Structures are given as C-alpha cells and as structure tokens.
Regions:
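Sec-exported extracytoplasmic/periplasmic mature domains
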Residues: 72-76, 95-99, 114, 174-178, ...
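Bilobed "Venus flytrap"/periplasmic-binding protein-like clamshell domains
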Residues: 44-72, 84, 107, 131-197, ...
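Short helices/loops that flank or line small-molecule/ion binding pockets
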Residues: 88-102, 115-116, 149-152, 191-204
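Periplasmic-binding protein-like
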Residues: 48-54, 127-136, 218-258, 269-289
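Glycine/small-residue-rich loop that forms an oxyanion/phosphate-binding "nest" at active or ligand-binding sites
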Residues: 111-129, 133-139
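A ligand-binding cleft/hinge motif common to bilobed small-molecule-binding domains
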Residues: 103-116, 175, 197-226
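N-terminal hydrophobic or amphipathic helices and topogenic motifs
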Residues: 1-89, 264-289
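Generic structural signal for residues in well-ordered beta-strands
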Residues: 79-81, 186, 224
C-alpha cells in the first residue's frame, strides 16, 4: 500500500526499542494550556477530542478547533478539544475515559494500541490523496552543513521524547555513521515548531521535525538536509470505552470530509495541514512495525 516501506521501518522500530532502554531524554517542558471555549449549541452530549502536544498549545487550538466545529456540525455530538502537556498524557486521557477520540503519533499509537486496545479509525491524507508522511532533518539555509556526516561535532534538536520523529532522527543519524555521542550536544524540545524556531535562530545546528513543519518554515530560512523513508500519516483513534454507534458516526463524518472539500461545501483553509485534506479509513496493519 503506497510506498511505505515496512522493511525499512521494522529495523527502525527494533532499533528504537533497544535504544529506549539506555537513552536518557530531557523531559518535556510543562506548558500552561490555553482555555478552550466551547460554542453554545443545542447538543448536550459532549465528546472530548485530544491531540498530542506535537505543536504549541496555541498552534493546536488554531489548527484543530475547526475540525471540532466540523464534527459538531456533522454528528449528533458537541465536540470539545482537550489538550495535554505531553504525548503520554493524551494516551492516559484515552485510557481513563477522559477523552473519546484523539490524534496520536505513530510511536504513541503503537504503545496505546498494545496496552489499552485503542484503535485507529481514520488516517489523514495529503494534498495528493496519499497517507504517506515524512520527517525531515533541517538546517538553516545559511548553514555550511551539506550532509548528515557533517553533523559530527554539531548540536542537534529533537522534538518530544515520545515523538516518532525523534526516534527516526536518531536512526537516520546512526545510519549515516553519526552517534549521539558524536554530537556536541543534543536536546529534546517540547514541540516540532520549537525545534524549527531554534534551528532558525542558531541555537542548534540542525534538528528533526515533521515534514509539514519543515515546509512551513522554508520561507523563513529553513533547509531540508535529509528526509526519512515514507511512514504512515498520524492516526486518529478511538478509545476502547466508546460504543460502536458513536465510533461509526464519527468515523463516517471524518471519511466524508474529503468529498465535502472536493465539492466546495467545506473550506479547510486555516486548518492544521495534516487534517486539511480529509481522511482515509484507518489500517492498524500499517502500524505493525
């Protein structure tokens, strides 16, 4: 299916499992979350939708609140966005029944699926209609770094310790012969956009971010040094406590979105890039790395 190479991703995941035993991460920064105000309406039944802290709280609210409004208008439920301070908090919210649906990352989804029975119901598509996703190692456009090997002795910024891109970055460096010990320093930052901002400011020589983030910072002076193999897009998931009727209704609304976009009925300008083109049905098999 598509060009997602499981033969490439299998050794990546095996590498990540082994590395997670010994790799010491810097904890995510606890960031105050903005208050999200629900729009009043006739629907009394609240459904909570979580998003892992891949971006700053302000960016998540800006990009995902339109999706909440779409779901509220196209289902019998009133959707409310619920943020978290780190990736695992969203998983905990799903497991404890505090949220019903969520956008997870690939790495957190594998953990949540195996531990709590959380299932993928939809996968975002890109502008070409594909579920392929990528992570990019970035540098400043003014940087003299031209290859991954040039990162020896340089500083490097990763996103959250629980982000798939963080692990992918470590693997890509290792494949190029660059160990973490070869870097002058490295750090896990809270958000992908913060990684790009710090590389842009010169606080780090390079960093690893989602490709959509790298693209959004290109005009500001970011250059892609290397791109990861294709990986599945981030899964939209349902908690195990959600009944089959609610699951089906929400899944149908998500899968119908791309038709409404194509028909000009729904305008997704200003939505988060990863959900602005609609969805395909979720396939758990793609995450069986």
């Amino acid at each position: 299916m598509n060009n997602i190479n499981l033969k490439v991703l299998l050794p990546v995941l095996l590498f990540l499992v082994c590395l997670s035993i010994s790799y010491v991460f810097i904890m995510d920064v606890e960031t105050p979350l903005p208050e999200i105000v629900s729009q009043p309406g006739e629907k009394d039944e609240l459904v909570y939708f979580g998003v892992i802290s891949r971006y700053s709280p302000r960016s998540i609210v800006s990009g995902y609140q339109p999706l909440m409004e779409y779901l509220s208008e196209n289902t019998p439920y009133n959707f409310k966005l619920k943020l978290s301070r780190n990736y695992l908090e969203t998983v905990d919210q799903l497991a404890m029944g505090r949220i019903d649906f969520a956008s997870l990352g690939n790495y957190t989804y594998i953990q949540a699926h195996n531990k709590y029975g959380i299932r993928c119901i939809a996968m975002p598509i890109n502008a070409e209609g594909s579920i392929e996703n990528y992570d990019d190692i970035i540098v400043s456009t003014h940087s003299e770094i031209q290859s991954l090997k040039d990162l020896n002795g340089k500083s490097f910024a990763f996103a959250s310790k629980q982000s798939f891109s963080s692990w992918m970055g470590i693997w890509m460096l290792k494949e190029a012969g660059v160990e973490l010990s070869d870097l002058s320093r490295y750090e896990n930052l809270s958000y992908h956009d913060l990684v790009a901002e710090k590389v842009l400011r010169g606080d780090f020589d390079a960093g690893m971010v989602k490709a959509v983030v790298a693209e959004s910072f290109k005009a500001s002076g970011i250059r892609v040094l290397a791109r990861s193999p294709a990986i599945p897009s981030v899964p939209l998931v349902v908690a195990s406590h959600v009944d089959s009727t609610r699951k089906r209704v929400v899944q149908n609304a998500l899968l119908r979105l791309n038709e409404l976009i194509a028909a000009g009925i729904v305008d997704t300008e200003g939505w988060d890039t990863e959900v602005a083109n609609g969805f395909r049905p979720g396939h758990d098999s793609l995450y069986n790395f």
